[in-house]
């Protein structure tokens, strides 16, 4: 099973020490309520070997290189274990000569977002809805002091720990299996990321308030979410599904989203990027058996979802507390 005690030791001597008032008991409850597959996934992490690493690159990729090349048999055993943790959604990872080609080219998003950010060097960072942690490792590559990701999905936790093990057990990033609504307001993070979360929230303004409560005064929010065209009054509320997703509630226009952030008390709100999701960025691979973007779009008109809504378009908004 995954041991959170090293994380407790890390935060005991950091600005996050007050989190120890609630976090250990929360995770103890979580461990009693885990999904039936969790024990199997955690064992797969245990089965992965400890490998000597010659070089780790988190600046331009998430990549580890072995001291000596792995044999074909060693590679195949690792691939077998990693494929037991499918589907791999956010990546890619290059681990000891193994290319984990995930559904999403999350490096595309990172390349769009990074140039606009306040430098991450020596920052304490929270990544909300972090998935398997790809962007967390890229934040570490930019010199972050510590990156904490939160995501309640047990598979993502096990994928993260598998990658960590193949990155020489790097402790600068940690994934905690909670939702932001379960976090006590800490108010200490220099940068808070929420990417691909807001449209899944029934109450988007509550989510913005929760993000603000984790930031220090002057800290930076990085918000990436689905948007639609329109003025400051326009919000798309899908009837049943959007791109085959049942849990999409509100897709605002960029001016509307800026208004929400200002209404929530953020300052210096600005949109730095808007991009239609491409079939190169989200696609099927051998590491994903499920459907992907091509299956969610109108086969005769890729500017629309299969339900007839505008195809996914994402904006990056920055703001300060």
From Swiss-Prot:
Keyword terms of this UniProt record: Transferase, tRNA processing
Reactions listed under catalytic activity: carboxy-S-adenosyl-L-methionine + 5-hydroxyuridine(34) in tRNA = 5-carboxymethoxyuridine(34) in tRNA + S-adenosyl-L-homocysteine + H(+)
Entry binding sites for carboxy-S-adenosyl-L-methionine: 90, 104, 109, 129, 151-153, 180-181, 195, 199, 314
Molecular functions (GO terms): methyltransferase activity; transferase activity, transferring alkyl or aryl (other than methyl) groups
Assigned EC number: 2.5.1.-
One Pfam family hit: Methyltransf_9
NCBIfam families on file: PRK15068.1, tRNA 5-methoxyuridine(34)/uridine 5-oxyacetic acid(34) synthase CmoB
Protein name: tRNA U34 carboxymethyltransferase
Species whose genome carries this gene: Mannheimia succiniciproducens (strain KCTC 0769BP / MBEL55E)
Source lineage: Bacteria, Pseudomonadati, Pseudomonadota, Gammaproteobacteria, Pasteurellales
């Amino acid at each position: 099973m995954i041991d959170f005690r090293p994380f407790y030791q890390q935060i005991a001597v950091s600005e996050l020490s007050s989190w120890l008032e609630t976090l250990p008991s929360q995770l103890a409850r979580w461990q009693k309520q885990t999904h039936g597959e969790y024990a199997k996934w955690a064992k797969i992490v245990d089965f992965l070997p400890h490998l000597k690493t010659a070089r780790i690159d988190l600046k331009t990729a998430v990549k580890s290189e072995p001291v000596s090349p792995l044999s074909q048999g060693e590679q195949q055993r690792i691939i077998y274990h990693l494929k037991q943790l499918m589907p791999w959604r956010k990546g890619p990872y290059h681990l000891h000569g193994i290319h984990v080609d995930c559904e999403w080219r999350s490096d595309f998003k990172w390349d769009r977002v990074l140039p606009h950010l306040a430098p991450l060097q020596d920052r304490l960072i929270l990544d909300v809805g972090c998935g398997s942690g790809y962007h967390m490792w890229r934040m570490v590559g930019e010199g972050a002091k510590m990156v904490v990701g939160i995501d309640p999905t047990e598979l993502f936790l096990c994928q993260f720990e598998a990658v960590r093990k193949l990155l020489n057990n790097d402790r600068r990033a940690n994934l905690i299996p909670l939702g932001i609504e379960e976090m006590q307001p800490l108010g200490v993070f220099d940068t808070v990321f929420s990417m691909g979360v807001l449209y899944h929230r029934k109450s988007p303004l509550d989510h913005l308030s929760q993000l603000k409560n984790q930031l220090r005064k002057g800290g930076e929010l990085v918000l990436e979410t689905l948007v639609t065209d329109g003025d400051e009054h326009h919000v798309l509320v899908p009837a049943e599904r959007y791109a085959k997703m049942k849990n999409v509630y509100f897709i605002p226009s960029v001016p509307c989203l800026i208004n929400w952030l200002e209404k929530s008390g953020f300052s210096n709100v600005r949109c730095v990027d808007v991009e239609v999701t491409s079939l190169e960025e989200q696609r099927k691979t051998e590491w994903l058996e499920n459907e992907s973007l091509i299956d969610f779009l109108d086969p005769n008109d890729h500017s629309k979802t299969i339900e007839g809504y505008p195809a996914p378009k994402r904006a990056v908004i920055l703001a300060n507390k």
